[in-house]
Amino acid sequence: MAKGFRGGFGGMGGNMGALMQQAQKMQRDIEAAKAEIDALEVDATAGGGVVKILISGTHEIKSLEIDPSAVDPDDVEMLQDMIVAAYNEASRKLAEISAEKMSKATGGAQLPF
């Protein structure tokens, strides 16, 4: 063995165990945050409230309510636009909440998910 060689990883020695524990805790926190996000329900409206949507944390539509006044057979495109707008708003809200929860779980580290 070379003189002065103590083994380990660049002198990190005892810190490696602590680093592994920290990584495992972060992994558990991330999994808990993902489960919490999946269980979320986020709502949004469009057209002054005539279209209401509720989506899950997995982006599935849970409910869609359309006020009868929004149904105009001569302007189906307007209703389609309101549904898309409501879904996009709910999805944006969900992304914001998800980013906040993941940031807390990772201690602010920007990790790809």
Residue ranges, per PLM feature:
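Conserved acidic
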Residues: 15, 75-82
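Short beta-strands and strand-coil junctions in structured, solvent-facing domains, enriched
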Residues: 50-52, 72-73, 91
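Long amphipathic alpha-helical segments used for membrane anchoring, targeting, substrate engagement
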Residues: 1-38, 93-113
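Short, contiguous, helix-prone interaction/anchoring segments in small proteins
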Residues: 22-63
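Stable alpha-helical structural segments in soluble proteins, enriched in small hydrophobic residues
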Residues: 82, 86-97
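Amphipathic, hydrophobic secondary-structure cores in small proteins
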Residues: 65-73, 83
